[in-house]
């Protein structure tokens, strides 16, 4: 059987709500974000994670704008909790995607693959929280200057696209923490409760998990891929 949606990477279930700047920013119970993954994170997975107390993200990168609109609407129907959309900024239909996100009442946007400077103010004017994914301390500084509300420090272990720096997650977390006071979320190679604890010790206030959530029943990843990964 495939893994259940939330806390699948924590050795023992959490018995109490964890309150910090990340949980307060998103209005969630646990500082656990499900990464927005191409072909993996549709409305079923995002809603399941949000219903379980984390923050589910729709992966807009692979979606036609109208497909994204459909997933947002279905996610609204499936959960009354916060969820967000991950948007790579380099996509050619970025203007249409941003307008759909605003029109459909999404309140949290994670941006990546580009400068957040152009869109952060526009999203804030519409009451949307903005989080930017960075691969270096230099980009973290630029993200804070752009006015984002939080940053994700994504190390080279991440299964998705990341930067050219090839900095590992455990090295990147303290480097980013040293240059910004923003709420910090760690990503890249985090799949257990022990890894989550290590990230918190190094200065992260939350974690973003991709691959582990891609293997859940709610993920839209190919079943052959799930089965292969689970039996490695």
What positions do the PLM features span?
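Short, Lys/Arg-enriched N-terminal segments with co-localized hydrophobic residues
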Residues: 1-18
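Active-site entrance/lid segments in N-terminal catalytic domains of soluble metabolic enzymes
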Residues: 15-183
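Residue-level detector of alpha-helix initiation sites
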Residues: 40, 190-191
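Conserved active-site-proximal phosphate/metal-binding subdomains
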Residues: 163-185, 191-232
